Amino acid sequence: MSKRLTKAEKAAQAEAAMIAAQNAELAAQADEALNADEAQAVEALAVETEANEAQADEAQPVVLSAEELRAKAEAAQTLLLESVQVRIDNAPSANFAKNMLAELNALSGRNALIAIEKCVELEVDFESLATAYAIADDKAHDYVAIYAAQKIRKSLFALATGMTSVFDGYTRSIMQNLVSLHSLSNRGSQRALSRAIVFDEAMQTEAVRAYKDCAPSTASTQASSTRQAMRFLNVCNVAKSKKDDAMTFTESKAAQKLQAMFNA
């Protein structure tokens, strides 16, 4: 009798191992579009959220209940995914479609939902963001280019987890300077990414530090997409002027959170 029981136990263990391996494979596929810091941060965020949900019944009343907050996050996630799918369906090239599909996968599932929920609390306007995502005309003012889409997604996870390492390196360098200087011109944003960009005497007013060092052409593209991403997330305002654009922080909770992250 004991011999048959041992075989049954072994069979059960083998089945459990197989299920665990399958689950691990699915988890790896879901995290494929995330970098290592992003995946680690999201995993910690999921654990924290589960603990908070377990204590929800004992928590003090809030303006928005946990159920209402989750419902808003689910609606926001649905809007985002629908808009990204529009871009995939209208992709100008196979490579663009591939990149947007990676964004679709990264914004899907429970981990992304948790990050979106955190950003709903930070006053990110997901309806406006989804509307912009759906624009397929690359000449439109609110068109979201692929670099900006990637930065928006990374920034959502960074704000949700409170980890500056989750921002892409270009955005991180620009934000480090903006937090220090409180206002940053377009030229200053590029200087934060490339030491090859030199100010003329009239523009030598910003003590900008280049935490990244790339080609000037790359700096221009990356600075532009970072400004766009921060504007869509209601983190920064961009004031236009004849001399140069200037980026400043908004009064939103997302902007306050970002500044606190870089000042920590």
Task: Please report, for each region that a protein language model flagged, where it lies by residue.
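Short amphipathic alpha-helical interaction segments
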Residues: C214-F232
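Short, Lys/Arg-rich nucleic-acid/phosphate-binding segment
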Residues: K240-A246
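Short, amphipathic alpha-helical interaction segments positioned at domain boundaries
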Residues: T250-A264
